[in-house]
Structures are given as structure tokens and as C-alpha cells.
Amino acid sequence: MTIRFFLIVFFSIFLSLNINSSEGLVNKLSQQEWSFKGLTGTFDRSALQRGYKVYREVCSGCHSMKLLYYRDLLDIGFSVEEVKAIASEYTVIDGPDDEGEMFERSAKPSDKFVGPYANDQEARASNNSAYPPDLSVIVKAKKNGVDYLYNLLLGYSDPPEETSISDGMYYNKWTDNNQIAMPQPLYDGSVDYDDGTENSLTQLSKDLVTFLAWSAEPELEERKSLGIKVILFFIVIGILI
């Protein structure tokens, strides 16, 4: 009785979460098929690596990812040598040394991602007083974050007639008041993919959002795998009793 009750409650919550996720803004958004969605969803490693390249070549010039370490890139399919090479392209401040002095060195896989700015003040000064948000968990900032970010990246256009846009702002139909401080970051062909994948705006955007979804929940696959095992366990126990 207890186990059957648990199963009923579990699946009720699961269905409720899926129903709730379809409410509100998502009804207006263009919804994409994401490999990592659903009970058995997983991340596409090729898409993750392409998405990291988009972040690295475009987004990292303004946006940090303070919660990630270079060694985390091993989880998306990069080899140890590739991760070492990626990290070595960045410089970090370390120390103090034996003489009490701080010093610069090349980053290592054990270091966090190096951000574009030394501090928040420099970030604001470089971006018309607007602070570029950290992207580590940006998909969690809004409900249906992956679809929202995807649509945001595609939502830039010239403003409609009689629409006033403040100085230093850009029109985007998915933002509050249809204005955003960030200029359009991606265009067709902005990044060349090493694997020959089409580098259209839609593909670049989808790959970037996939990478950002992983950075927000790197444990997602492990959690889903454990969840399935738990569900199967209780189903079997429920049948046996």
C-alpha cells in the first residue's frame, strides 16, 4: 500500500511538472526538440563541444562562467590533452610565491574558467554601464530557460515603426519592453565548426543553448539515470507485493 501510494504521488508530481512547464510564455515561444529533455534525455556531446566553441569565440568576450572549471570539459567529450591545451591559452594570477609576490601563470585544468574582466566595475565600464551576467546557470534565470534563450538569440530585428528604442539599447521582441543592452551576438557564419556542421544562426544558437543547459545541470544525466533505477525498483517491489 505504501509503495503504491509513493508511485501514485511520484507520477502525479512528474506529470504536474510537465504540465506546468507548458504554461505562460512558453506558449508563445518557438519550442525546440532538445536531446536532454524528457525522462531519458541525454546531452549530445558533439552539440556540447560546438556550443562551447560558440561561447569561447563569441560570448566569452563579455560573459564569464565562474562556476565551471576547465576540467569540466572532460565531461563533454574533450580529451585530457585538449583540455590542457584549452586551459593553457588563458592566464591566471597565482601566489604568493616564496617571496610573497603574486605572479601570472598559464591556467591549468584545475582552474576555473577565466573571465573577461578583472572586476564588476571594469565589466560595467566596458558595456555602457550594463553588467554582462555570468552564464553558468543562465538557463535557470527564466522559466523554460532553454527555449527562452534560443528565441532571444533569434529575436533581434529592426524595431517596428513608431517604436522608440533608448540610446545604447537594441530591439528584441522577447525582452521586457522589447529592449536589450546586448547587441546581437550571433549571425549566420559567426563561428566555423570543425566537424562541418552547418553554421547557421539557428544552429549556432541551438548549440550554444545546449552548452549552457549542460553548464547549469552537469549532473543531469546521472540524476536521470538514478531516477529511472529508483522508479524501476519501486515498480518491481510494487508488483511483488
Where are these predicted regions, by residue range?
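Post-cleavage N-terminal segment of exported redox proteins
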Residues: 2-42, 214, 241
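Electrostatic cytochrome c docking/interface patches
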Residues: 28-53, 64-78, 82-83, 196, ...
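The canonical Cys-X-X-Cys-His
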Residues: 55-66, 208
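Active-site-surrounding "flap" and adjacent substrate/cofactor-binding loops of secreted or lumenal enzymes
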Residues: 75-100
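Membrane-proximal low-complexity regions enriched in glycine and acidic/polar residues
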Residues: 91-180
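Extended, hydrophilic extramembrane loops/domains of integral membrane proteins
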Residues: 174-176, 180-217
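Juxtamembrane/start-of-transmembrane alpha-helix segments at the extracytoplasmic/lumenal side
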Residues: 216-234
